[in-house]
Amino acid sequence: MDAQSSAPVPPPGCPAHGGRVPLYGPEFAADPQSYYDYLRHYGPTAPVELSPGVNATLVTEYSAALQLLQDPTSYRRDSRRWRELNEGRVPMDSPVLPLLVHRPNALFSDGAEHLRLRQAITDSMARIDQRRLARSTRQVSDFLLAQFGYRGSADLLSAYAKQLPLFVFNELFGCPADIGDRVMFGISGMFDGVNAEQSAQVLFGAVGELIALKRSRPGEDVTSWLLQHHAKLSDEEMVHQLSLLLGAGVEPLGNLLGNTLHRLLTHDAYAHQGGLIDEAIDDTLWENPPISNLGPHYPAADGEFAGEKVQAGDLLLVSYAAANSSPILAAERRASSRAHLAWSAGPHACPSKDPARQIAMTALENLFNKLPDIELAVPEQMLSWRPGPFNRALVSLPVRFTPSESAQRPQPAESAKPAPAAQPAGKGGRWSQFLNWLSK
């Protein structure tokens, strides 16, 4: 990579003169596109730092990203190959490690093992009834809107976009009240970074109980279908596959909802109905994908990638955001509005993109049908984005609207705050409240 010949100017606040470009911090969060524009001066790949002491090569060019994603023989997903980690050069307390270290699930597996685990997931997800999914999403949407619709204002991110996927996935996976409360506590805590280790233990414990329940009493849900699959997943494999599906589904989908809402509320070209919501989802996936940079790969052998030398075990990361926004992609975008890489590509492409899109579409349509005059409560420039290399996510999305006459003020028990982060939710958590509301 010859960064000196073109002498690109780093974006403001970027300490990248002659070194790796940091993909973290408030400057990157405020304007990641200027970083991607700068990184393109290096060529199809660029040297980056994911957090202090964690180095990677970022693939920023669309065709190079496809080459990486579609060649599982030359570039592996098993992070036990990560050379710098094996050499002790990666800080073990780095905040990015939880999303990169190996776990025995489909995301970090290769070859026949990956095919077995992935097939169980794709076959089970394919059994989801689309009408049931739409109905469940509308019910969850109505419940959440009832919690704040009477107020005339809300943080749409914490009250709606982040909550809705948790509820819908709980229903899809067949969680009873007590287990569902703990699943929601565990996932929220892991992604919020508050007591993450305890939250992970709560999640794994709840998922383990769910698996035991579904082995003895199967139902029409994803958990039961995974257990019944001919892949014959062990209990340990089930825990990791379910945790992967929940974690990889809930957080990105919540951010897709948040980012699409941001787009709909800040671009006058969109109407809050019909096909334009669908168009706004596509535009968000192109220009502001919820997962900006991920898809870790490791060369199986020393060689060359995109014109640059690579060593076996180097960490190569795909920038879905940079690849999607490449200036040379205008023709591809005109040819297909869904040729973006937001769902990744190749054998590790998102297996849940169709249900995720349906959930997003249904949730947004129902929101704007119930609150048609919703608008930002603050100037757009006051909105802030969470720092970090992987997700593109707002901190909050304050809105105002005419209070909904159909929204009922929740009773004190229903409006109770979630359990403190220091302790798991007990009986009467959010999922229990929803099930009680649904039964009325």
Placement of each model-derived feature along the sequence:
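Cytochrome P450
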Residues: M1-K440
